[in-house]
Amino acid sequence: MTALVAPSYTGKSFIAVDMACAIANGLRWHEEFDVTHGNVFYIVSEGRHGIRRRVDAWHRKFRVALTRETTNLHFSRQGLNLRDKSSIEAMKSDMRLIENIKLIVVDTLARTFGGGNENAPQDMGEFINNCDDLMHEF
């Protein structure tokens, strides 16, 4: 598990999209780091259209064809509350339809935190445990 932590509007989602596209397409990340090629499940909790535009721009930059039939990048159909078991189970149902998931992106923490206090150890612990659960199942 890795977290991209920085103030708002500093490019965290750009980095996540870049990494996700590299893994989904089996290309070295930043032409320097080897990746394990496979499916990526991207949980989009804000800016769905912005993420799609960034993915399209990434494909143009790296001259990689983007088609529904060949993409390994899968987007959630709904938001996620990572502190609510029913929300997590609904997301898992969608994820189980995809084989060989190598990366799960949760974008953003604030929107998937379910009204918890990010500074409260109990709330953050619950969030991390539920992320661990996703990671271990997939």
PLM regions: where:
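Short hydrophobic/aromatic beta-strand immediately N-terminal to the Walker A/P-loop
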Residues: 2-5, 41
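The conserved Walker
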Residues: 8
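Conserved glycine(s) of the Walker
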Residues: 11
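Hydrophobic positions on the alpha1 helix immediately C-terminal to the Walker A/P-loop
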Residues: 15, 19
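Gly/Ala-rich phosphate-binding loop of Rossmann-like dinucleotide-binding domains
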Residues: 24
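Conserved inter-motif catalytic segment of the P-loop NTP-binding fold
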Residues: 28, 34-129, 133
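Sensor-1/coupling segment of RecA-like P-loop NTPase cores
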Residues: 135-138
